[in-house]
Design a protein with these regions (language model features):
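N-terminal cap/lid segment of alpha/beta-hydrolase-fold proteins
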Residues: 1-37
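Short, surface-exposed "cap/lid" segments of acyl-processing enzymes
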Residues: 25-27, 35-69, 76-78
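Alpha/beta-hydrolase active-site loop
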Residues: 59, 83-102, 121
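Primarily recognizes the serine-hydrolase "nucleophile elbow" in alpha/beta-hydrolase
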Residues: 97-151
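Short beta-strand/loop motif that positions the catalytic acidic residue
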Residues: 149, 155-157, 161
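Catalytic histidine-centered segment of alpha/beta-hydrolase-like enzymes
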Residues: 163, 187-199
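Short alpha-helix in the alpha/beta-hydrolase fold that links the catalytic acid
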Residues: 165-174
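Catalytic histidine neighborhood in serine/cysteine hydrolases
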Residues: 174-190
Length: 216
């Protein structure tokens, strides 16, 4: 999908690998927690500046440390061209394709801020392979076709978000025609104020989505 010029990876220990794919449009970085052949894969889409950590004081890497196991992988995606929606969606699609070739059967997609739109579009593109989508302080731009998302949708937002107000999550729910919105009082765009609550919520919600997809 990306016409790579070269790819290299290194083992970081603790079941983590860093994979770099070089293309004419930039470098795609993947921080891969868990086995390469996992059947259940969590794709984590960064905000508009890229990176691996996600919101809430490193939620994505925390989930990688706690959820990755024998049949589950958590992959943090650092885009080739941050803030470019079409290119970032292709980055997630290429990552999902890599996972499927290695044995993946279902996905949960997470996205923060700009990455919320990437996650929703990726969930739509994955179709029956998508077990769920969760967004954190999402933007509404780029979510115009959210009604195509068949998987469960969870939209999490800080009430004190001054970058993208919580009305953005309500707009996306309206566009999707489904989904659950949770607004956290006292939390801003990075949701650091409710980091522990989000970690606990995701530690339950993600396995539930995989289990429901597996049996349904």
């Amino acid at each position: 999908l990306l016409a790579p010029l070269a790819t290299q990876q290194t083992n970081l220990g603790g079941g983590r690998r860093l994979i770099e794919t070089y293309t004419m449009e930039g470098m795609l970085g993947l921080l891969w927690h868990g086995p390469s052949g996992a059947e259940d894969v969590v794709l984590c889409a960064a905000g508009g500046m890229g990176g691996y950590l996600g919101p809430a004081d490193g939620l994505y890497t925390h989930l990688g440390e706690t959820l990755a196991g024998a049949s589950t992988a958590v992959v943090c995606v650092d885009y080739r061209r941050p803030s470019h929606l079409e290119s970032s969606l292709l980055d997630l699609a290429a990552t999902a394709d890599r996972a499927v070739q290695q044995g993946a059967r279902r996905f949960v997609v997470l996205g923060h801020s700009f990455g919320g739109a990437v996650a929703i579009q990726a969930g739509c593109a994955l179709g029956p392979y998508c077990a769920g989508v969760a967004t954190f302080a999402t933007q509404s731009a780029g979510c115009e076709h959210a009604a195509q998302l068949a998987a469960p949708l969870l939209l999490l937002h800080g009430a004190q978000d001054r970058i993208l107000g919580p009305e953005n999550s309500e707009i996306v729910r309206s566009l999707a025609g489904q989904g659950e919105v949770k607004v956290f009082e006292g939390a801003d765009h990075l949701l650091a104020e409710v980091a522990d609550e989000l970690r606990t919520l995701m530690a339950t919600w993600i396995p539930e989505r995989f289990a429901a997809h597996r049996t349904g």
